[in-house]
Design a protein with these regions (language model features):
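Residue-level signal for beta-strand positions within conserved beta-sheet cores that form or flank
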Residues: 31-33, 98, 133
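N-terminal beta1-alpha1-beta2 submodule of the flavodoxin-like/Rossmannoid cofactor-binding fold
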Residues: 1-92, 152, 156-169
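Short, conserved loop/helix-junction motifs that constitute active-site signature segments
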Residues: 94-98, 128
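A short beta-to-alpha transition loop/helix N-cap that caps and shapes the active-site region
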Residues: 46, 111-112, 145
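A charged, well-structured terminal subsegment
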Residues: 126-170
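Short, glycine-/small-residue-rich phosphate/pyrophosphate-handling segment
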Residues: 102-140
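C-terminal basic regulatory modules in eukaryotic proteins
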Residues: 69, 101-102
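A short small-residue
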Residues: 1-6, 101, 138-146
Length: 170
């Protein structure tokens, strides 16, 4: 059994980035993958910001470091991922993600910040030794249907990422 850890960097529940994570996790074979979802908005701000490392934060860091596949997900604020995600990854030791694959997921209101995933989140996780999937996911408002379901382009991006995961771990 392989471990996949999704890290939600949005300060709000039911965000678009969380919806994408749920679609990915629901598509992974549960007989092959044990999934953990870490919602950073639920971890104490003192632990995250003051690095006091309470038990909940320690457990989240350890689960992430031990994961085979990591899915950090964040909305785009000021052309980059959230501070929640930043302070979480800042607490990891150098090279702590060596050998782990990462599928970055980022959402925004428009395609204008689509390169922010490549200029922000990707270098951050690579600095910790992670191997980044080629099929990262950046989705914006127009890629969702009016009923809130994922549109065809978003489904296609998710499917491309799932196929890459299957090739890596198949």
């Amino acid at each position: 059994m392989r471990n996949v850890v999704a890290i939600l960097g949005s300060p709000f529940s039911q965000s678009s980035s969380e919806k994408i994570v749920r679609l990915i996790l629901d598509s992974l074979n549960s007989n092959e993958w044990a999934a953990t979802v870490i919602d950073l908005s639920k971890i104490s701000a003192d632990d995250l910001l003051l690095r006091s490392k309470g038990p909940e934060l320690d457990q989240a860091l350890n689960k992430t470091i031990e994961a085979d596949l990591i899915i950090p997900a964040s909305p785009t604020y000021r052309a980059t991922y959230t501070g929640l995600l930043k302070v979480f990854f800042d607490q990891m030791p150098p090279e702590s993600l060596s050998g782990s694959y990462v599928l970055p997921v980022q959402t925004g209101g428009s395609p204008h910040h689509s390169l922010s995933i490549e200029h922000g989140m990707v270098p951050m996780v690579r600095s910790l030794g992670a191997l980044v999937l080629a099929n990262t996911i950046y989705a914006w408002s127009e890629q969702w249907n009016k009923d809130g379901s994922a549109g065809a382009d978003l489904i296609s991006m998710i499917q491309d990422s799932l196929e890459e995961i299957s090739r890596l771990y198949g």
